[in-house]
UniProtKB/Swiss-Prot annotation:
Segments forming domain KH-like: 374-458
Coiled-coil region(s): none
Subunit structure of this chain's protein: Associates with the 50S ribosomal subunit.
SUPFAM superfamilies per UniProt: P-loop containing nucleoside triphosphate hydrolases
Family the entry assigns: Belongs to the TRAFAC class TrmE-Era-EngA-EngB-Septin-like GTPase superfamily. EngA (Der) GTPase family.
Superkingdom assignment: Bacteria
Matching InterPro entries: G_ENGA, GTP-bd, GTPase_Der, KH_dom-like, KH_dom-like_a/b, P-loop_NTPase, Small_GTP-bd
Keyword GTP-binding: yes
GO molecular function: GTP binding; ribosome binding
Compositional bias annotation for Acidic residues: 172-190
Name of the coding gene: der
Protein name: GTPase Der
Organism: Shewanella woodyi (strain ATCC 51908 / MS32)
Length: 488
């Protein structure tokens, strides 16, 4: 399971700066979908070979009363469920009463916590950081998040135990190698067969009170809920094996399956970290949206995370029954306007409470998974690349036309197409989006994002010295140049 790092601290100590530095390397995929913005509170990060989820908890003002009563429930849950807590302090401001109150709260939680003294640039860092040892949370790590100083070392140290325990990849170059890897036809077929035989992991996600629990109960059947109503840990979602129409599934329930008497609770506990971990671990995301509230910013944040993770996607607009036709028309119009950039995702209008439309969800889930694990040959991918190139020539870069040579499969779930050529990494984002959309239309991909990666081909003449002309060849060249000038 991917580890979670929570950033904790009073306001203005640099949590957002560190968050942006850690997550900015993962913005590229979200940028492929105009109209979708990255969530400012949580995101995926990749640094020094580690991949992890980072959460900016916020919500702590440091006062004793604030710790107990005014801290947002989201922040409490994030601290409780995180694997590692980075407790940020301000080295310039020194130790404050707010820092001491937060540290006392963290000590009571017995979390794996690292004290980070931020903003050490331009000051005597050792002297400034000495007083933070009084917090009683162990070693104090120095960092200047705005400049990036000390960030990599901090993450490496904090996540090293999880690398060993979870077998995480520590080789920073492996991701690039994975991108470049070309499947043989036999390997591609074997991988597809393996994926098709596995149960489909389906994560039901959505903001609070959209009906996740109701839908989960409807899918499982009321009589099965009690079976899975066992006390679980607060850190993990519930994994429920099930079968439908002869196909095996694992339903990842982020809300927690409850007894019938508890389903009608007005407030549903929402855990961001549970949701993000479920998205990382699943094959298909089922995003539930409330028809009465329309598309909220939190919906777009969850959607962006799912797309960034490359997950297949089905959208269910819940509570569709009992609303007027003019409201339905308005909701559909808003969906077209705000979700037009993910036209590959099926949208269903359902009532989880009454079961209307729920049965058809699994048709789209299976379609999305099959699209995400579909095998396409190198020859087909190269032919589509050539057709795209004929329809719309790549632009000139440094006075030379970018040339696309061939394409091959680079992975499944999500489908990855690797395009090789000359100077392809210098292609503008607009042309890369054109290629992504061209592949999606040509392959008739439904229910899953498709990733197109570009790999520059090696120049066989690079590094070779050009052969020097002989004296006679030099004279002949000069005579020819003079002759050309005279003709002009």
């Amino acid at each position: 399971m991917i580890p979670v790092v929570a950033l904790v601290g009073r306001p203005n100590v640099g949590k957002s700066t560190l968050f942006n530095r850690l997550t900015r390397t993962r913005d590229a995929l979200v940028a492929d979908y105009p109209g979708l913005t990255r969530d400012r509170k949580y995101g995926r990060a990749h640094l020094s070979g580690y991949e992890f989820i980072v959460v900016d908890t916020g919500g702590i003002d440091g006062t004793e009363e604030g710790i107990e009563t005014h801290m947002a429930e989201q922040s409490m849950a994030a601290i409780e469920e995180a694997d590692v807590v980075l407790f940020l302090t301000d080295a310039r401001a020194g130790l404050t009463a707010a820092d001491q109150a937060i540290s006392e709260h963290l000590r009571r939680r017995e979390k794996t916590t690292f004290v980070v003294a931020n903003k050490v640039d331009g000051i005597d860092a050792d002297s400034a950081c000495a007083e933070f040892w009084a917090l009683g949370l162990g070693e104090v790590y120095q960092m200047a998040a705005a400049q990036g100083r000390g960030v990599t070392n901090m993450i490496e140290y904090a996540l090293a135990p999880y690398a060993e325990a979870l077998g995480l990849n520590r080789d920073g170059d492996d991701e690039e190698e994975k991108e470049e890897r070309e499947y043989t036809e036999e390997e591609a077929e074997a991988e597809q067969t393996r994926l098709q035989d596995l149960p489909i992991k389906l994560a039901v996600i959505g903001k609070p009170n959209v009906g996740k629990s109701t839908l989960t109960n409807r899918i499982l059947g009321e009589e099965r809920v009690v079976v899975y109503d066992a006390p679980g840990t607060t850190r993990d979602s519930i994994y429920i094996p099930m079968e439908r129409d002869g196909r095996e599934y694992v339903l990842i329930d982020t809300a927690g399956v409850r007894r019938r008497s508890k389903v009608n609770e007005t407030v549903e506990k929402f855990s961001v970290i549970k949701t993000l971990k479920a998205v990382e671990d699943c094959n298909v995301v089922l995003l539930i949206v409330d028809a009465r509230e329309g598309i909220a910013e939190q919906d777009l944040g969850l959607l962006g995370f799912a797309l960034n993770a490359g997950r297949a996607l089905v959208i269910a607009v819940n509570k569709w029954d009992g609303i007027d036709q003019d409201i339905k028309d308005r909701v559909k119009s808003e969906l077209d306007r705000r979700l037009g950039f993910i036209d590959f995702a099926r949208i269903h209008f359902i009532s989880a409470l009454h079961g209307t439309g729920v049965g058809h969800l699994f048709e789209s889930v299976q379609e999305a998974y099959e699209s995400a694990t579909r095998r396409v040959s190198t020859s087909m991918l190269t032919r589509i690349m050539q057709m795209a190139q004929d329809d719309h020539q790549p632009p000139m870069v440094n006075g030379r036309r970018v040339k696309l040579k061939y394409a091959h499969a680079g992975g499944y779930n999500p489908p990855i197409v690797v395009v090789h050529g000359n100077q392809v990494k210098k292609l503008p984002d607009s042309y890369k989006r054109f290629m992504m959309n061209y592949y999606r239309r040509s392959l008739k991909v439904m229910g899953t994002p498709i990733q197109v990666r570009f790999q520059d081909g090696d120049n066989p003449f690079e590094g070779m010295n050009t052969k020097k002309l002989t004296v006679s060849q030099e004279r002949r060249r000069k005579r020819m140049m003079t002759h050309i000038k005279d003709k002009k």
